[in-house]
């Protein structure tokens, strides 16, 4: 089923993602578990569906620190999650020095895109922090909270859903 805003239903997007990456590893866990964690955190924070789906697919093309075995084409990803979500995924995957790039907005993204990237990577780091006890990661999450608080008044109301 194709929806009006050039994307498939949420359920179809999730099912396709899961079937594509069923056995993919990500560190000591499955890639699906991490990405579903990111998606769930974004949902709990009340993020729009486009952002949640971008969070689910956030590293399907590979990143500086992760290279998936399964390869999806941009065309296929766009077909499922839509143009805006795919653009966020593509941007996220291509970022070098991701945290500095996003926090300092080194690529001069417009306010909306920067805020979306802040949310996606905040959820990404939150999911990782649940299995790692890393003081640097906790400090980085605090920086993201500060950046999100200044760009999104809604964040102040939702950030306590998940404690660091």
What are these regions (language model features)?
Residues 2-164:
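Active-site helical microenvironments for divalent-metal-assisted chemistry
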């Amino acid at each position: 089923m194709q929806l009006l805003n050039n994307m498939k239903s949420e359920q179809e997007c999730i099912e396709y993602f899961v079937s594509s990456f069923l056995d993919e590893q990500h560190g000591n866990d499955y890639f699906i578990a991490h990405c579903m964690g990111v998606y769930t955190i974004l949902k709990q924070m009340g993020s729009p569906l486009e952002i949640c789906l971008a969070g689910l697919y956030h590293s399907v093309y590979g990143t500086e620190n992760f290279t998936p075995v399964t390869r999806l084409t941009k065309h296929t990803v766009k077909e499922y999650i839509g143009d805006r979500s795919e653009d966020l995924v593509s941007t996220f995957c291509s970022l070098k020095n991701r945290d500095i790039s996003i926090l300092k907005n080194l690529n001069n993204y417009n306010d909306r895109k920067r805020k979306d990237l802040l949310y996606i990577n905040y959820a990404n780091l939150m999911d990782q922090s649940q299995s790692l006890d890393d003081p640097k990661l906790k400090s980085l999450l605090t920086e993201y909270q500060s950046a999100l608080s200044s760009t999104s008044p809604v964040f102040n109301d939702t950030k306590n859903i998940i404690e660091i």
